Amino acid sequence: EGGWPTSSSVFAKASGPSNPAEYTSKEFTGECGVSKPWYVRNDYNSPDEEITLVEATAQSINTAFVGLALQLGGDACKIRDTEWRMGLHQASGKKIPPYPAAIILGATSVSPMTVASAYQTLANEGVYCPPVPVLSIVKDGKALALPALGSACERRVDAEVARGVTRLLQGPLRSGGTASGSGLAGGRPAAGKTGTADGSNETWFVGYTPELSTAVWVGTPNDLRNERVVRNICLRPAGETKGCSAGRYGSVFGATIAAPIWKAIMDRTLEGTPKTPFADPGSAITDGEKVDIPDISRRSLDDAKALLLQAGFVPSVV
C-alpha cells in the first residue's frame, strides 16, 4: 500500500488511439513484467506530460496509471497482491495474470460481482466482506439460522489509504470527469470509474456510496469473436420496436451506457435514504508526510550522507 499522496503528479508518456506509448521489459521489475514491448493507448491524443493523480483518474489516462506503477518501483506483482487482498480475481478464482496490462489496466476476465466486491472494500474503508448470495432461508414459516453476515469481514487495506483512493475516484463523476453526466440524484456523494476495453467490446462502470457498491458490464460473449465489437448501438425503451429514441452511439465507452445504467440502479435503490458523506483522508494521504531536511551545508561528504541517512533519506551522489 505504499504510494504517493493524492495531490502528487505522475509522468504520462505521449499516447493516442493511433500512436501508442511503448513500454519495455527494462522498465518493470519482479515477475510481473513484459517480455516484449507493450503498447498502451489513450482514448485521445495526449503529449508527454506530468499530470496529477486527480486529473489522471478523472480523465482515465492509461499512460498515467502505467507511469504511477513505474514510479512505485515497477513491480506490478505488489499491485496484484493488493488487488487480491481487496477481493479482485479472475473469473476462475485465480489471481490476476502476471502481466502489467491485466494488473494495471484491467485487461483480463473478471466478473462484475468480483469487481463490485473489490470496490466495496474501498466503500467500507478498507474492510473486505465476501459477497453473500443468500440473506435468509425460510422453512415452514420459520427462518433458519445462518452465520452472521459480518463474521467473515476483515480489514484488507488501511482505512486512510482507502479514503484516499475514494477521494480520487470521486473525480470521474464530477465536472470534467469521464462520467460527469452520471452523478447521483440530489448530489449524493459517490465514487467510481469508467472502463473501456480495446475495440469497445467491453465497457464498464463500477461505483459506490458508503452503503452500496455496484458494477455494470456492457459487452458481448467471447464466442462471438470479431462480432464482439460494440459499435453503432441503437437504444430504445422497452416496448418500442423502431427508432432510437433513447440514443444512438457510433462508439461506446464506459460512460456511454454502463454509467447511466449504474446511475439508474443506484438512484432507485438509494431513493429516500440519507445521503452519507465519505470520510476525508488525513493530510498524510493527501499531501504526504512532512519531514525536516537536515542542514548539510559546509559538511564533508561522509558527514552529509550520515545525517541524511539518520533522518530517513537515501542519499545519492551525482
Report the location of each language-model feature.
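Short, glycine/proline-biased beta-turn/loop segments that scaffold the active-site neighborhood
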Residues: 1-50, 129-144
